[in-house]
Every structure is written in structure tokens, then in C-alpha cells.
Amino acid sequence: MIWIVGGTSDTRSLLDKLSEKINLNNVIVSVTTEYGEKLLNDYNIKVIQKVLDKNKILDFIDKTNLNTIIDTSHPYAENISKNILEVIKSKNIKYFRYEREVTETIFDERFESLKD
């Protein structure tokens, strides 16, 4: 079983790629918002919509026959990634971080107010 920690458009990109290779019946995706869950309605997968703290992560892992975690959570959502890594230290579960390349934003002009 594969657990995808969702939360970005990368989640859907990954699901599209995975669906070409494996049966998505063996995939569970977790998201924290109803909107995130709604975005996954087109996929034939189990979606869990809730905030997972360490205890909930441990409980989820213990109740699920996981062998792989793919973390596609938002880069600023550091707690979920950190908590997962702490929980799986003593487990035989593979962990992968799936993250798009960060692009640098350059501003040409700055404004003091909207009137400018």
C-alpha cells in the first residue's frame, strides 16, 4: 500500500504518472482540506481528509499495510513531513519526498501603495 501525503498540484501530477504504472486501488491520499479532497474526485482512490498529528500518523500507519510513503505536501507544511519521518524511524517503510523545482521570483519594480 502506498500513502501519498497530498496538498499540492504535484499530488495530481504524481497520481497521473502512477496510474500509468500501477493500480491506484493500492493508493491512499491524505489531504487537510475539503478543497484538496474535491480536487481528487476524478481519481479512483481512497482519500482521507484530516489534519494528522504524530499520534494520528502512527495510528494510520498501524492500521494500514503501508510499505511506501510519497510526500507531496506543500514545502511550507514542514510539520507533517517532520512528524512522518519521526514516526517511521522504527518502521520498515520507504519514504520519498516529491517536490517540484523551486523557481526564483524577481521583482522589477516595487510600489509604495496601490496608487503608484
PLM features per residue range, with description:
Residues 58-116:
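Glycine/small-residue-rich loop that forms an oxyanion/phosphate-binding "nest" at active or ligand-binding sites
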Residues 9, 52, 78-79:
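Residue-level recognition of alpha-helix initiation/capping sites
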Residues 19-21, 44, 64-65, 86:
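General N-terminal targeting signals
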Residues 1-3:
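Extreme N-terminal starter segment of soluble prokaryotic enzymes
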